Amino acid sequence: IILFHEGNISKDDKDYISSESVEYIKFINVSEYFEKISLKLEEEEKFNLGYRQMCRFNMFHIWNKVENYDYILRADEDVEVLKFNPHIFEYMDSNNITFFTGRFSKEIHRKTNETLPDYLTKNTNLDVDRIYNHKFPYTNFYASKVDFWRDKNVLSLLETIALSDKQIIYRWGDIPVIGGVLNHEQERIRLFPKLEY
């Protein structure tokens, strides 16, 4: 288990979390991606800089941090899993599955819907009408094959989106970016079998 943190977790907290887990937990400090940025943020009262940087991390930087793994299972700290196939990676491998999600989601953030499609049209070769279809995976709990995201063309596309100042300014989340890339690559987004969370 990997627990990414912003350098704000004490040794006592790490020890406590580790003592409550049957699995070994590797704590990785990713505070380098959460430094102060001087940009005028739209809707700053709703979404602070840290939230926007968390979205950036989860759409782009994470793939460099997990490059030595074949698969990842992302579970945000607010997720409680009640029923789940513990052999999901083996299932994905034997069935050549790239991506599982807990549920689908539309992008409901107005500023993202107003600005991201236009940015994609101007800065990528994506068929925006086809890929920005609101058939996106909800990203608080998913499993994915890492090498899909480590592909140089996919990483380049993610970099173009994630490292744009507009991602921070307008609070583009990882849902439409992850979903849009999967749609662009024509990767089927599947629902986890036998999941309750």
Q: Residue locations for each model-derived region?
A:
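Catalytic beta-strand/loop signature of glycosyltransferases that borders the donor
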Residues: 102-104, 188-196
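Conserved beta-strand elements of beta-rich interaction domains across eukaryotes
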Residues: 8-9, 32-34, 78-80, 106, ...
